[in-house]
């Protein structure tokens, strides 16, 4: 039997207008920098009026973006202490919480998911999905990663926020070729998994991507970005190897996740992942059909000019 496929869209989107963030996203209307500075004074030195007279920060400065994240997490989510080591991925909070809002909409429509934990695949040193799921939605979360340094940093964050330490558990994936296998337990079940796959196929490709983003930011400020030997490629999103690339890139990772989910069909009520490259949707849908998925959904999200998608699927229970 062919899987049931649906694309979750809004009336606003169907009319060709920008969809924008989820209606419940606290950051839908931008940032209240005055309130954020009051909650986190270290943000103040980075805040200034932009060309339009609005308060903002320079998003090309890693220190500024990290201070903004600290303020957002403290002001909106009660996470009093958050930090990442230099060079690790600094995630955009509005986009990350948008994923979780859409996921919670899906879970509310799905019987049998109340009280089940989430599985955060590749939590990274920032642990952002686990932290937001626990603080904003009250979910228990199992967070996994292939990098011990990332898990060590998340453990430090949890110790600084005792309320979250009780809801989030960390697991090391010892085999980097595995995603679900070996890091989950027999008869364990999750409401859903969340995942932000590595985007690039190699370290060189990741470096080129960073340079393009640097040039884009410089252009938006009317400046010229100079690259080459001796020019450090730093940017607020940073990222270590495991956070930015894997062999075969995003498509290869997604297909491996689909294959493993088919071997563990009852592990999650819904398997979900971000898909950054729209060209990867078709091969993923084809693989899901081949692996016997009973339902497939694509949920579109928009943050500014950037459009991403959540791919969600499930299998008929075999228990």
Swiss-Prot record:
Keywords: Cytoplasm, Methyltransferase, rRNA processing, S-adenosyl-L-methionine, Transferase
Segments of skewed composition (Polar residues): 7-16
Record's catalysed reaction(s): adenosine(1618) in 23S rRNA + S-adenosyl-L-methionine = N(6)-methyladenosine(1618) in 23S rRNA + S-adenosyl-L-homocysteine + H(+)
Primary localization: cytoplasm
Keyword rRNA processing: yes
Molecular functions per Gene Ontology: 23S rRNA (adenine(1618)-N(6))-methyltransferase activity
Family per record: Belongs to the methyltransferase superfamily. METTL16/RlmF family.
Protein name: Ribosomal RNA large subunit methyltransferase F
Lineage: Bacteria, Pseudomonadati, Pseudomonadota, Gammaproteobacteria, Alteromonadales
């Amino acid at each position: 039997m062919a899987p049931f496929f649906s694309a979750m869209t809004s009336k606003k989107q169907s009319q060709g207008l920008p969809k924008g963030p989820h209606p419940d996203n606290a950051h839908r209307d931008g940032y209240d920098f005055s309130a954020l500075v009051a909650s986190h004074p270290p943000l103040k030195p980075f805040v200034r009026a932009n060309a339009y007279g609005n308060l903002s920060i320079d998003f090309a400065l890693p220190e500024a973006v990290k201070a903004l994240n600290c303020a957002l997490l403290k002001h909106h989510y009660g996470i009093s202490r958050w930090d990442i080591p230099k060079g690790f991925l600094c995630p955009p909070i509005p986009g990350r919480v948008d994923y979780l809002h859409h996921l919670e909409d899906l879970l509310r429509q799905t019987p049998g998911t109340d009280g089940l934990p989430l599985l955060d695949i590749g939590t990274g040193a920032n642990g952002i999905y686990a932290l937001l799921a626990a603080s904003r939605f009250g979910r228990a979360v199992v967070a996994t990663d292939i990098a011990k340094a990332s898990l060590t940093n998340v453990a430090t964050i949890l110790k600084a926020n005792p309320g979250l330490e009780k809801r989030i558990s960390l697991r090391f994936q010892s085999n980097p070729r595995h995603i679900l296998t070996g890091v989950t337990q027999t008869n364990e079940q999750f409401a859903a998994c969340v995942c932000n796959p590595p985007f690039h196929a190699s370290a060189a490709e990741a470096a080129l991507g960073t340079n393009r983003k640097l040039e884009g930011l410089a252009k938006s400020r009317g400046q010229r970005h100079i690259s080459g030997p001796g020019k450090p490629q730093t940017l607020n999103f940073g990222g270590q190897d495991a956070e930015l690339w894997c062999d075969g890139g995003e498509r290869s990772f997604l297909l491996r996740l689909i294959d493993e989910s088919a071997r563990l069909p009852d592990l999650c009520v819904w398997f979900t992942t971000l898909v950054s490259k729209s060209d990867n949707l078709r091969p993923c849908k084809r693989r899901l059909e081949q692996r016997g998925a009973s339902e497939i959904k694509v949920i579109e999200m928009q943050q500014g000019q950037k459009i991403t998608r959540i791919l969600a699927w499930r299998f008929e229970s075999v228990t």
